[in-house]
Structure formats: structure tokens, C-alpha cells
């Protein structure tokens, strides 16, 4: 989780100007609509929709925006989005997985390929790097819901594989097929999590020097700036000095 979490921390520290925030809201709304279309518009019966709503709340997305995105799915309005996964390499041989939702596969493929190329990376064939990652569930809680030992005990008892606790909170990792049961057990005990969902977790992370790290950060930023891209997962770890520098 190191690389992915480090990069997200950098983006949060940088803050978001209105234009970027609008793009974030647009992507969150798209995920809410897609999740509601694929399942039920009731988040209590649709784990993916519930995760999307939690993500939207974490970004302070207005309640009206969330409700409109759900209604769009219920009313059958809007585009039908196809979910696509891209894989590629960045500077230093780092591996990246890109998740996108698109109504035009050719446009998105071209945009993602261009983003890789412009920033010193290369788009690869499907399956080229996925074997370096595991599909896992993640449930994150605020630090004050429990101490580290209590969270670890509860998570292991629920069937989780790992827990990382620090001053920022608790992050519980579990196998994809155990995600539903683990989520239900932990939420029943500790309440609503900060965020939850399925992610791609690197099996191992590679350390990169700061020069390469800056190039990789720029690559991820360019990819995430594409309208159709929802998530980017990486397998590199940055030095703490670079994290502080880029997040300042």
C-alpha cells in the first residue's frame, strides 16, 4: 500500500483548486451512477454504491450531487459506461494499473496511451503487470474508534489478513472474497468507516530515487487528469523527504 497511499497523501496535501475539485466531483458522480446501475440504488444493499458514497463524502461532495447521481441511474438517464483496466510501466520500471469508466473505448485508450508516453511511461498489454498486484478489500476507520490492538484483534477475528494502524487511522486489508463478511463485522462493531472498497494492492513495492520519484508522480498526475480515469494503483515507494517536498 505504500506507493498508492503516499501518492494520495501528496494529492490531499496539495489541496484542490475549483477546476480540479469539479473534475473530482464529476468522477465521483460517475462512479455513484455506475454502481447504482449495476446494483440497486439502495446503498445498504449495494456495497459498491455505499463505498462510492463514502468516497464522495470524504471529498465533501454536496448531498444534492450524490442524490442526483443516484437518480440518474434510477431514471436510466445519461451514458452507459464500460469499465476498462489498463496496465503499464513508468520510469524506473514501476508498474501501474489504471481503472477507467468510458462511453468511448477508443478515445480513452488513446488518452491513456498519450498520458503514459508524455511522461516517460509506456502502455502495456492487459496482464503485463496485474500479476504483481492482488485484488483486495480495504476498510479504513478513524483513529479514535479503537486502539491498535483492539482493531487488530477484531479484524483478524472477522477474517482480515492485515491491519495498519497509525495516527491517521486504521486500514484493514482482506481477501476479495472475504470483503463482505469482514466489512459487515467491523462496521457492526466500530460504525461507518471513512472509506471502503476493492483496490489493487502491490505484492511488493520498489524503492525509487527522488529524481525517478518526481517523474512517477508527474506520470500519475497526468493519467489521473484524464476525465475517464477513476483510479491509478502503483508499486513504487517514495522517500519521506520527497513526500514532504511534493506535498508542501
UniProtKB/Swiss-Prot annotation:
Entries under Gene3D superfamilies matching the protein: 1.10.10.200, 3.30.70.980
Alphabetical keyword list: Cytoplasm, DNA-binding, Transcription, Transcription regulation
Major place of residence: cytoplasm
Molecular function GO labels: DNA binding
GO biological process: regulation of DNA-templated transcription
InterPro entries: Integrase-like_N, TACO1_YebC-like_2nd/3rd_dom, TACO1_YebC_N, Transcrip_reg_TACO1-like, Transcrip_reg_TACO1-like_dom3, YebC-like
Locations listed in the record: Cytoplasm
Keyword DNA-binding: yes
Keyword Transcription: yes
GO CC annotations on file: cytosol
Similarity comment text for this entry: Belongs to the TACO1 family.
HAMAP family: Transcrip_reg_TACO1
PANTHER family: TRANSCRIPTIONAL REGULATORY PROTEIN YEBC-RELATED, TRANSLATIONAL ACTIVATOR OF CYTOCHROME C OXIDASE 1
Protein name per the record: Probable transcriptional regulatory protein Mchl_0946
Organism: Methylorubrum extorquens (strain CM4 / NCIMB 13688) (Methylobacterium extorquens)
Amino acid at each position: 500500500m505504500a506507493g498508492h497511499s503516499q501518492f494520495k497523501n501528496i494529492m490531499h496535501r496539495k489541496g484542490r483548486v475549483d477546476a480540479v475539485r469539479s473534475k473530482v466531483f464529476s468522477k465521483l458522480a460517475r462512479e455513484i451512477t455506475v454502481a447504482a446501475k449495476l446494483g440497486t440504488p439502495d446503498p445498504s444493499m449495494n456495497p459498491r454504491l455505499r463505498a462510492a458514497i463514502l468516497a464522495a463524502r470524504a471529498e465533501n461532495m454536496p448531498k444534492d450531487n450524490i442524490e442526483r447521481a443516484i437518480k440518474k441511474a434510477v431514471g436510466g438517464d445519461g451514458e452507459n459506461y464500460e469499465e476498462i483496466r489498463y496496465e503499464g510501466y513508468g520510469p524506473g520500471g514501476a508498474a501501474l494499473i489504471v481503472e477507467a469508466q468510458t462511453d468511448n473505448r477508443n478515445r480513452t485508450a488513446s488518452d491513456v496511451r498519450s498520458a503514459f508516453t508524455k511522461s516517460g511511461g509506456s502502455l502495456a498489454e492487459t496482464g503485463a503487470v496485474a500479476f504483481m498486484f492482488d485484488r483486495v478489500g480495504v476498510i479504513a476507520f478513524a483513529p479514535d474508534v479503537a486502539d491498535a490492538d483492539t482493531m487488530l484483534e477484531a479484524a483478524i477475528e472477522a477474517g482480515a489478513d492485515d491491519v495498519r494502524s497509525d495516527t491517521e487511522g486504521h486500514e484493514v486489508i482482506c481477501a476479495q472474497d472475504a470483503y463482505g463478511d469482514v466489512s459487515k463485522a467491523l462496521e457492526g462493531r466500530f460504525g461507518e468507516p471513512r472509506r471502503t472498497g476493492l483496490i489493487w494492492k502491490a505484492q511488493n513495492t520498489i524503492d525509487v530515487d527522488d529524481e525517478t520519484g518526481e517523474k512517477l508522480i508527474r506520470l500519475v498526475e497526468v493519467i489521473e487528469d484524464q476525465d475517464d480515469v477513476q483510479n491509478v494503483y502503483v508499486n513504487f515507494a517514495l522517500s519521506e523527504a520527497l513526500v514532504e517536498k511534493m506535498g508542501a
